[in-house]
Every structure is written in C-alpha cells, then in structure tokens.
Amino acid sequence: MAFNLRNRNFLKLLDFTPREIQYMIDLAIDLKKAKYGGYERKHLTGKNIALIFEKTSTRTRCAFEVAAFDQGAQVSYLGPSGSQIGHKESMKDTARVLGRMYDGIEYRGYGQEIVEELGAYAGVPVWNGLTNEFHPTQILADFMTMLEHGKGKRLDQIKFAYLGDARNNMGNSLMVGAAKMGMDIRLVAPKAFWPEEDLVAKCRLIAEETGACITLTEDVKEGVLGTDFLYTDVWVSMGEAKEAWDQRVKLMTPYQINMDVINATKNPDVKFMHCLPAFHNDETTMGKEVADKYGMKGLEVTEDVFESEHSIVFDEAENRMHTIKAVMVATLGD
C-alpha cells in the first residue's frame, strides 16, 4: 500500500508510523531491484538538493549523491568549511535561504535541535543524515539488510543485540526503530552507557502497542542468546576527545564482538552488522594508534568476525544508498 509522504521531513523515526517506515523500506527494496534490473525510473528529474555536512562522511555523502544522480537530481555539497552556517548566519536564516533555492536539504551534524530548526524553516523536505542523537537513514538500511538476511522473517520476528555504547545515536535509533517495528532488541552495555531514561520510556510505550521487546542488560551472554543479528558501533563517537579513549576502552572491552560472543548466541547463522567505519585491525592511522597504545588489533569487533561469513557489513553499507534514495523519492519524488 502506498503512502503519501510527499513534502514530509525525515528527521527521526519517532515521527513516523510503523506502516510508513515499512513502506520506505519496501520502496528501497523495489528501487534496488530496479537499479540492478536496469529499469529504474527517474522520480527526481530537475530537482536540486543541498547536502549540508558539518561532520565529514564517506557512506552518507556518497549514498545521497549517487541516489540523487540515479534519480535525475543535482546536488550541491556544503562541507564543514564550505558555508557560513553557524558562524555568520543562523540555521533559521540558512534554512530560509536554501529553501528558496533547493527542493530538498540533507543535514549531517551536531544537535538534533539544529536539524529540527532547519526542517521547521526551510519549507522543503529536510533529511537527517546524522545528528548526535539520531541516525534514522542508517536504521532503514539496517532493517532492509536484516530482511534480506533474515531467512524470510518479518521485522517483528527478528531478535538482535546491540553491544557497546548504547547511549549514542545508533543505540538510540536502533531502539526507536525496534520499538516501532515490533522487534526484539537487547541493548547490551555498561549501565552508564544505556540510553536516556526518557527515551527508553517513550520506546516502551510504543512497544506496548507494537509488541516489541526492549531489554537493557550488562550481561553479554544473556543479551546475545538466541539472536539473529549482532550489531556494534565505535566506542568513541565522532567529535569526542581522544582523552575519552582510555576509560572507554577499559569499560567496553567486555562488550567486544569476537568469536566467543558469536558462539554465545547459539545460532550458527547469526549475522554481524556495523554502521562503519569499524576499528577491526591496525590498517588505518587510528587503528595503528589503538594497537600501539592498547595492544589490541581491533576494538569493538575483532578481525576474524569482521571478515567472517557472519559479517554482512558491506551489504548493509550498500543499502544506505537504496534506503536514502527511497526517502528522497517518497518525500520529493513525482
């Protein structure tokens, strides 16, 4: 069933019903099939899209650009040093300027209140590419990937665990998404790194309606048992000081996804997910610093898990583009 999401902002999953979320995922699946099949139709021809990036990006930027190009749109990239936003011009004013020039605006940056203000004043669809609190386009890609690898299970039949820093934008967003879609989510983390209590309470209220199960636990074995998917993210988020590493590594090491954790699921077909980039070896500058300082080749996930048959991280990364395309088509397409 089609939904009319035209001219809607896409700022956080809390703003959407389960059926609207499922519609966007289904649309992404259809668009992916069309791209691979060579019969994709352009729904954004003649549209101009602004991409505001106050934080750097690989996957999100590329996904928005390729998705827009595939659909016939033109994009302008405004990078961290490429505009006056927040320096000489407020977001409220920027929104009203860009809204006169562009048909849609993506924002990736800091506080959720910034993208909310952009959405309130732009007068055109605004899409959240990541804020400190939420990362909704990633969740659409994650759930699409779970459907592809879930052996025919619906989202409300899937069990998954998120290990690590559960108070960050990924922990928040996965919990909201799971609550909306009636899923069984286990947030496995030190108690100090659980999501804010008010957000947990909101999600539990949603879960009462959807049948979702939300578990917060510090016990890794209890949290991962019987899951279909294991998910993690970096232990120190974008913008945090390097000084945070020492304490974070000490607290988070028990929550590393390694082969012992894979085996603890008791599911030989369990799949591993990560929004990327991941610290899984010492082949990057940061990875080498970590290896030299802590004697660990890999932090939140080990190399043997990341490169194993359990890992579906690159399918997940590709699906960023298909789901972002679906969001733009649903809210801006003809």
Swiss-Prot record:
GO CC terms: cytoplasm
Sites where the protein binds carbamoyl phosphate: S57, T58, R59, T60, Q84, R108, H135, P136, T137, Q138, C275, L276, R320
Catalytic activity: carbamoyl phosphate + L-ornithine = L-citrulline + phosphate + H(+)
Location in or out of the cell: Cytoplasm
Binding site for L-ornithine: N169, D233, S237, M238
Keyword Amino-acid biosynthesis: yes
Its job: Reversibly catalyzes the transfer of the carbamoyl group from carbamoyl phosphate (CP) to the N(epsilon) atom of ornithine (ORN) to produce L-citrulline.
Protein name listed in UniProt: Ornithine carbamoyltransferase
The species this protein was found in: Aeromonas salmonicida (strain A449)
Primary gene name: argF
